[in-house]
Regions:
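Charge/polar-rich, low-complexity and marginally structured segments
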Residues: 53-166
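Short, solvent-exposed secondary-structure boundary/capping segments
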Residues: 24-35
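Short beta-strand-centered aromatic/proline hotspots
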Residues: 14-24
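A short macromolecule-binding patch
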Residues: 37-52
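Conserved nucleotide-binding/hydrolysis micro-motifs of P-loop NTPases
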Residues: 23-25, 43-45, 55-56
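Loop/turn positions that initiate beta-strands
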Residues: 5-6
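Absolute protein N-terminus
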Residues: 1-2
């Protein structure tokens, strides 16, 4: 069980701080049911409520600094399997995002990055599906790593590149 003040990942939205754990005083809500009150750190003023008894697959622990460093160093070894069928590719992207798994998210980032380079060589742009999932995956992964490693978001990509090259 999470407690007030914990930071978690709300899949697929954002890093959130648990502001409260308890029953909600809102109309249409079971007043005997406990909820986590989450405050997304990048969406000031927003609130997300998740039933305490229904968190599986919806929130997860944020990774530790040590795990973040180990993850970054393992990024070159993450396999990015290409999927030729456009519909199946979007389904795989969606599954990776909804899993909340940094490894799966990094794999689709690598895949889309490679597709972007290949399409650029052909004088083409990325598909809107690839572009949309690339931005979402990049936001999810880089936001968590930036937060955990205390590196400004605008510098995290270079930080990762420098770490991989070291």
């Amino acid at each position: 069980m999470y407690k007030k003040g914990d930071y978690v990942i709300k899949i697929p939205e954002d890093i959130c701080e648990i502001e409260d754990v308890g029953c909600l005083d809102m109309s249409g809500v079971n007043k005997d049911k406990e909820y986590y009150s989450l405050a997304p750190i990048n969406q000031k003023g927003s609130k997300i409520y998740i039933p305490v008894d229904n968190v599986h697959g919806r929130i997860r622990n944020i990774i530790s600094k040590e795990d973040a460093i180990a993850f970054i160093k393992s990024m070159p070894d993450i396999d990015e399997k290409d999927i030729q069928n456009e519909k199946m590719r979007e389904q795989k992207y969606k599954e990776a995002i909804l899993s909340g798994s940094n490894k799966k998210i990094a794999a689709i980032l690598k895949l889309i990055y490679i597709r972007k380079q290949e399409r650029a060589e052909q004088g083409k742009k990325l598909s809107s599906t690839d572009e949309r999932y690339f931005k979402l995956a990049e936001y999810m992964l880089f936001s968590e790593l930036s937060f955990v490693l205390n590196v400004p978001r605008e510098h995290i990509e270079q930080y990762i590149a420098d770490m991989i090259e070291a």
